[in-house]
Amino acid sequence: MKKTAIALLAWFVSSASLAATPWQKITHPVPGAAQSIGSFANGCIIGADTLPVQSDNYQVMRTDQRRYFGHPDLVMFIQRLSHQAQQRGLGTVLIGDMGMPAGGRFNGGHASHQTGLDVDIFLQLPKTRWSQAQLLRPQALDLVSRDGKHVVPSRWSSDIASLIKLAAQDNDVTRIFVNPAIKQQLCLDAGNDRDWLRKVRPWFQHRAHMHVRLRCPADSLECEDQPLPPPGDGCGAELQSWFEPPKLGTTKPEKKTPPPLPPSCQALLDEHVL
């Protein structure tokens, strides 16, 4: 498991010094009926909605990065989740990266978030709204111990667990990625109501936020869904494997060349950028 500082930096690092991808040259959503195209890690979106940055229930971080675009289903999910959180007195929901105006590949920080169906949400629920300065330069609250084996008790709360559970119980949500230690704590705390845990998937980093992914909309015919998570709550051998030391002889996988774009996404780039 990577050290805390490196893990958090990977999510919050500024991309200003990296070469822009063609998708970053598209500054407004592409007109048309909303269509998520391709896969979460190789796709785009037509007709994206803009998440309103003003809301009583949530706040949007790093608005200067302009990553608050997504499929209308994603915008409605964020509004729905944050309203439920407010009704339960959990606090203000802090919204991180969604996607770019036309989706597509980032120049760093994300492999997915390309079809307008992904959103990062801080696992903090402030009772007092953040200032503009705090939102522009958010400070992540690392919930995981240095050795990566458990959450930090003084930072974990039932409210955080409730927020994750609310998101997982939403019918549009297909996966929620969190650090393995966070998944482990959810497993310990869940009690008999465990069906929602199937959607909560352990993944590298994700020590301070959850990454929520929605299913492909029914009318997005070129959208590629992932297979459903394995049956069960995911709290057994699969989860424990994340805490085992790496096998001898394993090497870091080589960086792969990005696959060709879906034809509709390439056509979108050809028309609007190239």
Curated annotation (Swiss-Prot):
GO BP, sorted A to Z: peptidoglycan metabolic process; proteolysis
EC number: 3.4.24.-
Molecular-function annotations in GO: metal ion binding; metalloendopeptidase activity; serine-type endopeptidase activity
EC class of the enzyme, as a word: hydrolase
Keyword Lipoprotein: no
GO CC entries: outer membrane-bounded periplasmic space
Keywords, sorted A to Z: Disulfide bond, Hydrolase, Metal-binding, Metalloprotease, Periplasm, Protease, Signal, Zinc
Region listing for Disordered, in residue ranges: 225-274
Disulfide linkage: 44-265, 187-235, 216-223
Residues noted as binding Zn(2+) 2 in the record, renumbered to the chain: 147, 150
Entry's cofactor comment: Binds 2 Zn(2+) ions per subunit. Zn(2+) ion 1 is bound in the active site. Zn(2+) ion 2 is bound at the dimer interface by residues from both subunits.
Keyword set includes RNA-binding: no
Signal peptide extent: 1-19
InterPro entries, per database record: Hedgehog_sig/DD-Pept_Zn-bd_sf, Peptidase_M74
Cofactor: Zn(2+)
Transmembrane residue ranges: none
Subcellular compartments: Periplasm
Residues the record lists as binding Zn(2+) 1: 110, 113, 120, 211
Family: Belongs to the peptidase M74 family.
Biological role stated in the UniProt entry: Murein endopeptidase that cleaves the D-alanyl-meso-2,6-diamino-pimelyl amide bond that connects peptidoglycan strands. Likely plays a role in the removal of murein from the sacculus.
Subunit structure: Dimer.
Protein name, as recorded: Penicillin-insensitive murein endopeptidase
Natural source organism: Salmonella paratyphi B (strain ATCC BAA-1250 / SPB7)
Gene designation per UniProt: mepA
